[in-house]
């Protein structure tokens, strides 16, 4: 985690530093250590940390029952299995979030149910994490395409009795914004191809490239 965090801190563009989300499933046997990652001051300062909570874990918290962790997380034949007290780990998440503002929580089963890419899982799309601030669930090699509209700018004659919201202009700009965001996806695909080609042509070992 420190390696990824430090690498991200070294990345900057136009004066803006890099951003990174590190997330792990609560089902992973090492998730408790992950949850404690930022309790030491000065550690993992270049990344946000979030834990993926599934429905079974939250039910175990409510019912005060045990919860099974395993590795690999999604394997039918895991090599490691561990029973934990769900409520105790939940309390640790709450305490750490209060103490250090992290970890964040991702209600993962809900995200997958509502995620558009996972509707096309048969075509290879799979949501694996989110952008650094958690707004957008993302697939591998995906990026967060964010666009903001200042709603105040559509208020005509603000702070007067004649004030009103210019819905016509707002709708026009929303359509243009959606068009821009869709075009960005096409440009992004070209950049991904260029990045992958650069990685393949680099002289580093396959172990380094894979990390």
Language model: regions and residue ranges:
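Active-site cavity-forming subdomains of large catalytic enzyme subunits
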Residues: 1-173, 180-211
């Amino acid at each position: 985690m420190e390696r990824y965090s430090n690498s991200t801190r070294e990345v900057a563009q136009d004066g803006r530093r890099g951003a990174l989300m590190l997330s792990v499933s609560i089902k992973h046997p090492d998730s408790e250590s992950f949850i404690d990652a930022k309790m030491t001051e000065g550690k993992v300062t270049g990344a946000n940390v979030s834990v993926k909570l599934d429905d079974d874990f939250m039910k175990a918290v409510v019912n005060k029952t045990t919860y099974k962790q395993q590795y690999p997380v999604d394997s039918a034949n895991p090599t490691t299995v561990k029973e934990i007290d769900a409520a105790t780990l939940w309390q640790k998440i709450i305490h750490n979030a209060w103490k250090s503002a992290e970890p964040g929580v991702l209600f993962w089963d809900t995200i997958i149910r509502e995620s558009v890419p996972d509707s096309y899982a048969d075509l290879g799309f799979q949501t694996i994490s989110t952008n650094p601030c958690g707004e957008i669930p993302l697939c591998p090699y995906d990026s967060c395409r964010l666009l903001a509209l200042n709603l105040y700018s559509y208020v005509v004659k603000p702070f007067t009795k004649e004030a009103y919201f210019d819905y016509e202009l707002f709708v026009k700009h929303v359509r243009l914004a959606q068009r821009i965001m869709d075009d960005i996806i096409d440009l992004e695909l070209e950049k991904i191809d260029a990045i992958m080609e650069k990685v393949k042509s680099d002289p580093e070992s396959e172990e380094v490239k894979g990390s």
